[in-house]
Design a protein with these regions (language model features):
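N-terminal Sec-pathway targeting helices
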Residues: 1-17
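Intrinsic disorder/low-complexity segments
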Residues: 14, 19, 39-42
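Hydrophobic alpha-helical membrane-insertion segments, chiefly the h-region
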Residues: 17-28
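Bacterial extracytoplasmic/cell-wall-associated proteins, especially those involved in peptidoglycan
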Residues: 26, 30, 34-186
Length: 186
């Protein structure tokens, strides 16, 4: 009988240990699954945020490239970079919208007249496809250098305005540089 009791006790102990082990494994597994599920939720949230950020970056690159193309396509590389830098200077100045696209597309109404910050936008060129791929690619490269790489021309660090040299806007601003056919002011 004592052998039977010992066997029963050993079997009971084994079952208890096995049950505890199974419970612990189950708890650990569920805990890992819960963390994995939470982690996946974060990844999904992070992925959607990432996709939104990529889409926003592409939007900003597109409008900056358009602005450079329509404002300075025939300018030398330095002139294209200068136009992009003025947009970024404005966006970073606190005097204009903080988003480069909003800077590009900004309109003002003065004496009941709509004035665009950049003339090509008022001329409705935003719906016109660029015809010179090489100039478009150069404009895109200038946009990338200024917006992504942070390239800046030192002489334009404070420039917020510019105009073509064949226009006389009667501004009372300090000229800081002339690059290509554009004159830059702070």
């Amino acid at each position: 009988m004592t052998k039977y009791i010992k066997l029963t006790l050993n079997l009971s102990a084994f079952l208890i240990v096995a049950l505890l082990g199974f419970t612990l494994v189950s708890l650990v597994t569920h805990n890992k699954l819960d963390r994995l599920t939470a982690s996946n939720a974060n990844i999904v949230g992070t992925m959607s945020e990432y996709k939104a950020a990529v889409k926003d970056k592409e939007r900003r690159m597109q409008c900056m490239t358009q602005n450079i193309y329509w404002e300075a396509a025939s300018e030398p590389a330095e002139g294209k970079l200068a136009v992009a830098q003025v947009v970024m200077n404005r966006a970073e100045s606190g005097k204009f919208p903080a988003d480069p696209c909003q800077v590009v597309y900004q309109k003002n109404i003065i004496y009941e007249r709509v004035l665009c910050q950049f003339s090509w936008y008022c001329e409705q060129n935003f719906n016109t496809k660029p015809v010179h791929k090489k100039l478009w690619d150069e404009s895109a490269e200038a946009a990338r250098m200024v917006m992504v790489d942070g390239f800046r021309l030192p002489e334009l660090k404070d420039a917020l305005y510019y105009h073509a040299d064949y226009v006389n806007p009667q501004w009372n601003k300090k000229q800081v540089a002339k690059i290509g056919r554009h004159i830059f002011y702070k």
